[in-house]
Amino acid sequence: MKNNLRYGIRKHKLGAASVFLGTMIVVGMGQDKEAAASEQKTTTVEENGNSATDNKTSETQTTATNVNHIEETQSYNATVTEQPSNATQVTTEEAPKAVQAPQTAQPANIETVKEEVVKEEAKPQVKETTQSQDNSGDQRQVDLTPKKATQNQVAETQVEVAQPRTASESKPRVTRSADVAEAKEASNAKVETGTDVTSKVTVEIGSIEGHNNTNKVEPHAGQRAVLKYKLKFENGLHQGDYFDFTLSNNVNTHGVSTARKVPEIKNGSVVMATGEVLEGGKIRYTFTNDIEDKVDVTAELEINLFIDPKTVQTNGNQTITSTLNEEQTSKELDVKYKDGIGNYYANLNGSIETFNKANNRFSHVAFIKPNNGKTTSVTVTGTLMKGSNQNGNQPKVRIFEYLGNNEDIAKSVYANTTDTSKFKEVTSNMSGNLNLQNNGSYSLNIENLDKTYVVHYDGEYLNGTDEVDFRTQMVGHPEQLYKYYYDRGYTLTWDNGLVLYSNKANGNEKNGPIIQNNKFEYKEDTIKETLTGQYDKNLVTTVEEEYDSSTLDIDYHTAIDGGGGYVDGYIETIEETDSSAIDIDYHTAVDSEAGHVGGYTESSEESNPIDFEESTHENSKHHADVVEYEEDTNPGGGQVTTESNLVEFDEESTKGIVTGAVSDHTTVEDTKEYTTESNLIELVDELPEEHGQAQGPVEEITKNNHHISHSGLGTENGHGNYDVIEEIEENSHVDIKSELGYEGGQNSGNQSFEEDTEEDKPKYEQGGNIVDIDFDSVPQIHGQNKGNQSFEEDTEKDKPKYEHGGNIIDIDFDSVPHIHGFNKHTEIIEEDTNKDKPSYQFGGHNSVDFEEDTLPKVSGQNEGQQTIEEDTTPPIVPPTPPTPEVPSEPETPTPPTPEVPSEPETPTPPTPEVPSEPETPTPPTPEVPAEPGKPVPPAKEEPKKPSKPVEQGKVVTPVIEINEKVKAVAPTKKPQSKKSELPETGGEESTNKGMLFGGLFSILGLALLRRNKKNHKA
């Protein structure tokens, strides 16, 4: 009896213990399963993808990662705290849905912040806390707060997590997206490590000069001031040292450009210091490592100063200052703006506000102001005359009503449309009258022009164009003359233009070499003599040889505070990116060295072959090939011509912009035409003196107070011999022809020479005068010729018209080939080099035609009929057939992922491994789950026995193995399930086995208890 009782008690204890132990195992392993996803070390995301977490140290790093999804955005804010603990505690309220690593190739859209603790207030929807231990015994608490989570989210960026190699070292990493440029710039913000050496700079010479060394500046004509410094530095300069100087707020260094920059300081081609524009008008230059070991350093610096239209809105005197090391350089300049174009009834004015070459966009402001009476049926149009993108996007046009007095309108054509006290937006009210086109044009209809309106335009231009010309035109009809609607209308036209080009002048062109000498003197510490750096280089260079032209080398545009400085009209700015040694950074002070009042002057023959000036200024420079004339401002009596100067100037960089004045203003009233002529002026730093001798007579023909001077323009070899000069004073037409070529040798048969250089030749007008200069030489024939010899030359057939501000200049150099030897039968030589020649237009209506055509020389003995034809039309190259695309790398098929049950708590079997490199395919892991609902153990994993405790200071092995699998997953093109789930961490498999083991314990215990009860009953 005692044995039975003892056996029953033993069974009772064993059964109760089994039930208790099994229950604890089941409950404990279940919680461990839920918390496994968050039980890992804090991961730091690095931009280069390198691992940044090392468990050997006790440092804590925090990473906030925002992942952009296709449908919604989910972000996790992780906060890490350290608490000393030697135990692992798990507390779970709810397990969040897992987000799978994407397996489709999508654009990267992950934004990361490196080593920055997130201080935002969390709005927890799911809170999960895991306390795991590392080798230092620290406890880390991680809060994951998903803002939104859907099963349809698909990440666009691959996330790779590296497997920990040891139990005490874990280095997960996440690939960084290209969309984090802003965060990258923020983390890599430039920090000055050098010393401020402004106090060590001595200003030996400092000056501010106006346009052409005057005290006047016309911003709308592209004029600006120039700051000149000659500086001396104390010894001991090092890399990173910098000095500052500050400009007054009425000027800036960028004009209408959105790019704010200043030229580099160079010694030859070596950059000694880089410049940057800071806030508050401060300019900073930072020395490079080339300044090391230099003593007795002196430098010269020149910087363009543009009048700020936001600060200086009216005409008048302005004091411009620059302060360096407490020494102030100042100059008082007279600023004058243009008034636009207008008549008795209305006025039209406009200017380019900003210009951004980086994205091919610009903005423009136009003022439409009524003067006297009312004008009805007004149409305002904005058109890109040059640089239009026919397949572009529609511009953004906003209409504002000006609420102030017309007398208070800024002369600088500046409009602060954010000031609601002066500007009221009425775009929505006029939406039915506003028409926008994809080519960048717009049209606005105004029923009654009884208020002043401002039209703000923001559009794009054609990428790669060398000129942008935007025309604003207004057509109106005075109200009191409405019955004469078709006869009494008027038109106002206002042009604003920018010229961008890459000039390839080599310095050996028509105007001679353009050399810029930059001085940078210093001494080395190790030698006694002085070393002088000399930089002799063409002012204009090829931009491709210096910098990538896509980065816009325009120097000047909008103000720092966003107001925007600008100039109207054709103002050409060329920046030479490697043009200045420390003394002259680019050629920023071109107008101070050589200037003109009006006309058109080109410094490079390659891009503009004819250089001439149209000027009445007595101090302007002239060259040997200048054509100078005076224009009757009212030749016909019914035409009113207003001349506005268009200024083109060269900067030191190859790529540049033209910002500036007005061109092509037309007013028509009472059947009379009002025309504003635009003359393009290019200001070049130092245009070389042109020397030479003209042979032959020089004729001066004066008629109707028109003075036309012709020099002896030579033939191709540089000499002009004129034995026959015909002067025809009919309709002011002057024809100058050179002598015909000579004949030598014996000629048999009929010899016929025909030359028709005037067939279908259009009229060329130059200020009411036609100047026609032809140089045509009939071929020189040597030897015996038999048969009929015929030479025909027609170099002017179908030649288009060339206009240059109403003035046409035509210079032809045509030579028929020289034929030597014996020729029999008929010889026919035809040349037509101008057939269907396209039209070229420079500036507004200014055009230049320069032709040099020489046919090849023919030598030898020819029998039979000889026909020589030359057609300069470029051959048509047949298109190259497309090369068939060959895949560079074979694609490795990816086995489909097993289907997963819909319950979020059911674990998903791991995806079979896919080789990371296509060229070395590897078979997937052989494990295949028996049932979709049950997990499959990964390869090389030993399940833990429940009785074996986890060692202190080591990471659980299942987590490590699963991390490796996540890393091995490569993106595939197969569609993925839209279900979101947590990544498998490896704890799942051991958890299930533990739960099974615990369940068996419980069942065994219950069986023993039941048997014990039966024994008691018995």
From Swiss-Prot:
Residues 986-1018 form a propeptide. GO terms for molecular function: fibrinogen binding; fibronectin binding. The modification Pentaglycyl murein peptidoglycan amidated threonine is found at T985. Residues 194-511 are annotated as: Fibrinogen/elastin/tropoelastin-binding. Residues 38-61, 78-195, 595-622, 740-813, 827-997 are annotated as: Disordered. Residues 1-36 form the signal peptide. A motif (LPXTG sorting signal) lies at residues 982-986. Pfam families: Big_8, Fn_bind, Gram_pos_anchor, SdrG_C_C, YSIRK_signal. Changing G222A: No change in elastin or fibrinogen binding. Residues 545-604 are annotated as: 2 X approximate tandem repeats. Possesses multiple, substituting fibronectin (Fn) binding regions, each capable of conferring adherence to both soluble and immobilized forms of Fn. This confers to S.aureus the ability to invade endothelial cells both in vivo and in vitro, without requiring additional factors, although in a slow and inefficient way through actin rearrangements in host cells. This invasion process is mediated by integrin alpha-5/beta-1. Fg-binding activity is not regulated by the divalent cations Ca(2+), Mn(2+) or Mg(2+). This is Fibronectin-binding protein A. It comes from Staphylococcus aureus (strain NCTC 8325 / PS 47). The lineage of its organism: Bacteria, Bacillati, Bacillota, Bacilli, Bacillales.
